[in-house]
């Protein structure tokens, strides 16, 4: 999981760093666990842009990941740790004792040959999955369900984890990576440990082209646009926009609260991120 710095043979490589990929044990995916991935370019079903600055990028195969960990009581051996172009984390190929194969997010410290299992009476070790009711207070977890049986939705990116800080009745209190403390039902499943590939945050792309390989297009400033395209656009020569910074839809963009005060999940948030 080390980061390798390239020799400055060109301006684009001068500050470029890449992963060493030393934990990768196989370069090709399990074909039965892949499917085609059609590019959306940030468009929704009506063809309208809903996520700006998306498009292009290298062709990818989607790896089908088991976020639910619903194969209870069946031990699985980690056959390979692989690269996944669709996420920042590495993925681990599991060979279950009954012959089935599945991908999971590769936790920190889990390597080829290790055995992991999901269930309510399993050891507290990285890679094992269980309900939050079975996890001791103080343990760090990842791939956390928000609704029982739906599959993990929290803490899936490289290096992320949440800490179980308390249990109150039917709820477990988790400290999220943002610092937010929120309630989650104790019947929700989580995987022990931290997501691997910690050095992902230290990667420097070095040049614009590397962002384009990932399907990320340039970000144009509002003040550089025409008045029809942005509230800050227009003016003679270079202008400051003439008003406080706003989004293309006129919503203040620096410090303005956008969360719905009537949102149902607000009662499950004990401490907002950034609060003392």
Swiss-Prot record:
Give the family this protein belongs to, as stated in its UniProt record: Belongs to the universal ribosomal protein uL2 family.
A Pfam family (short name) is Ribosomal_L2
Q: Which gene encodes it?
A: rplB
* CC terms in the record's Gene Ontology section: large ribosomal subunit
Q: Region Disordered: what ranges?
A: 26-45, 224-276
Q: Specify residue ranges for compositional bias: Basic residues.
A: 259-276
The record's listing under PANTHER family reads: LARGE RIBOSOMAL SUBUNIT PROTEIN UL2M (PTHR13691:SF5), RIBOSOMAL PROTEIN L2 (PTHR13691)
Q: Which UniProt keywords apply?
A: Ribonucleoprotein, Ribosomal protein, RNA-binding, rRNA-binding
Please state the span of the N-terminal signal peptide per the UniProt entry.
none
This protein's source sits in the domain of life called Bacteria
Gene3D superfamilies, alphabetically? 2.30.30.30, Nucleic acid-binding proteins, Ribosomal protein L2, domain 3
Cite the record's note on assembly.
Part of the 50S ribosomal subunit. Forms a bridge to the 30S subunit in the 70S ribosome.
Name listed for the protein in its UniProt record: Large ribosomal subunit protein uL2
Any one GO MF annotation of this record? structural constituent of ribosome
Classification via SUPFAM superfamilies: Nucleic acid-binding proteins (SSF50249), Translation proteins SH3-like domain (SSF50104)
GO biological process entries? cytoplasmic translation
Q: Does the keyword RNA-binding apply?
A: yes
* Protein purpose: One of the primary rRNA binding proteins. Required for association of the 30S and 50S subunits to form the 70S ribosome, for tRNA binding and peptide bond formation. It has been suggested to have peptidyltransferase activity; this is somewhat controversial. Makes several contacts with the 16S rRNA in the 70S ribosome.
């Amino acid at each position: 999981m080390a980061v390798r710095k390239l020799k400055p043979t060109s301006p684009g490589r001068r500050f470029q760093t890449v992963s060493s990929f030393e934990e990768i044990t196989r370069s090709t995916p399990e074909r039965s666990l892949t499917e085609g991935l059609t590019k959306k370019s940030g468009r929704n079903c009506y063809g309208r842009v809903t996520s700006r600055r998306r498009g292009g990028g290298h062709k990818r195969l989607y790896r089908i990941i088991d976020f639910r960990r619903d194969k209870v009581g069946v031990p699985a051996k980690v056959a390979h740790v692989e690269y996944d172009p669709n996420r920042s984390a590495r993925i681990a190929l599991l060979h279950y004792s009954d012959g089935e194969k599945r991908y999971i997010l590769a936790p920190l410290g889990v390597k080829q040959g290790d055995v992991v299992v999901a269930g309510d009476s399993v050891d507290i070790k990285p890679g094992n999955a269980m309900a939050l009711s079975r996890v001791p207070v103080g343990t760090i977890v990842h791939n956390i369900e928000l609704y029982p049986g739906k599959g993990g939705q929290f803490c899936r990116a490289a290096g992320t984890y949440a800490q179980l800080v308390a249990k109150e009745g039917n709820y477990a209190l988790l400290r999220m990576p943002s610092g937010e403390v929120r309630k989650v039902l104790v019947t929700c499943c989580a995987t022990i440990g931290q997501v691997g590939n910690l050095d992902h945050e230290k990667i420097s792309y070095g040049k614009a082209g590397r962002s384009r390989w990932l399907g990320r297009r340039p970000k144009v400033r509002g003040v550089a646009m025409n008045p029809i395209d942005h509230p800050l656009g227009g003016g003679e020569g270079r202008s400051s926009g003439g008003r406080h910074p706003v989004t293309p839809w006129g919503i203040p963009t620096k410090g303005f609260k956008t969360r719905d005060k009537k949102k149902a999940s607000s009662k499950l948030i004990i401490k907002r991120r950034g609060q003392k």
